[in-house]
Amino acid sequence: GGGGGGGGNTPDGSMISNSMQDMSDEDKKRSFANFTDSFGRQNSQSGNMSDAVGASPSTGDNGNVKFTNIGAMRILQGDADAIERARLILRSWAELFFILFVFYVCDRTNTFPERTKSYSRDFFIAIFVTLAAYGCYQTLRQSKTSAPLNREQTEEWKGWMQVLFLLYHYFKASEIYNAIRIFIAAYVWMTGFGNFSYYHVRKDFSVGRFSQMMWRLNFFVLFVCIALRNDYVLYYICPMHTLFTLFVYFSLLVFKEHNTSTNMIVAKMVILIVLVYVIWEVPGVFTVLFKPFEWLLSYTDPKKPDVNPMHEWFFRSGLDRYVWIYGMVCAFVHPKYEAFVRWVDEKPTKEKTVIQGLILTVNTIAAYWWYTTYYVLPKLEYNVVHPYTSWIPITIFIIFRNFSLTMRSYFIHIFCECGKITLETYISQFHIWLSSSVPNGQPGMLLGLLPEEYPVLNFMLCTAIYVGISQRIFMLTNDLKVACVPNANNRLLSLHAYFGVAWFIGMGIAGSALLMAI
């Protein structure tokens, strides 16, 4: 996922959800502004919610916001004015907790029966081809730019991969395991590509922006882990993208004033390759490095209790340990690649056709070689070579997708929309589409809402509900990010962080006491 992370990595979406249809745009804006004012006075000049993090009406002598005067504390104190101002955000929190309750009911109770997974290659292919055909005929849109790897294109790429990834889980389509590994590698590639593009071009290393990225990757999964008592690594996409995002961020943050130097960027990438090699391939280093984080990154499958708790994290993170660096490389050379494809576009028709034909021929030969050499390997053998070869199919796809102006200028909107919610669909599938029943259980069964003799109708109903809820989670995550993670006031951000930590500690103590009492 999406999960995900600038570029095609982890889209933030609109800063304020457009889902609150029962209110006018002015009412929505006023409510969010008032709520933010209870956290810190809104910047009346810009009117931008992301800037609404200035000084509160009640501040200390130095102009800094007092902890007791932030909106959350005033709400806890029963301040009617603060509660009224925060009504939309409180409604968002209430909706979030209701969704978590739905997760619990579907996956931890016997309210709905479980169904057995059944794979039909014919049905699997038919679903995807039908969706793709509909997308091509009904939702083909022109991009805002014809640049290679533009935002719409990467969202589309994530979208169709996510559809296949989810169908793979739903039907247990083990025969496409190697393809799924490549899809996940492509997501990780986008982490390197998107984050490098953002930090290298915009040079925005602010704590606020970084915190918003961490919120996007981890906010919802944290609540799911708490509500369902699951380990963080069960949703391995989230910690994996978080780790590689941290690598990209800090590698560019160090000596950031020299990031305009090609030699410095090359040196940083070489250092990253060496670092990754040492961590994952020198025996013992991984264990020592991540030992302090074992409390967070350990995972025990109930069906395999004797496996080392850190094995899952080592395996998952190690499969794609290099490809995010390749994403950084691609982002760095992207301007030259864009200049090349535009140079080809400007050639006379005859010359352009020859060049594009040559590109397609070489790319096709490379694809055939990769397929017959690596893709056809059995699962375990493929896993061994995957970390070193996943960049090949990614490059092949990029070249095919961008070889002509027409190919770069259009995208399939329905897949683009799917690509925006990859992180949410990834997390939600475990509990309201599939079923595991126990903490840390792998989702080996299906959620059943209809009688067993209607598997196709059950699939359609569950999918409609599941996608709708995932879309709402995406919107809620962004709505709450606006209020809770200010991006221009580090003092206010730190107060919110202190409050959040205190709240989680308090809830943890209360929950432990409740469990002991039961």
Whereabouts are the PLM-identified features?
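Long, hydrophobic alpha-helical transmembrane bundles and adjoining juxtamembrane helices/loops
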Residues: 1-3, 7-518
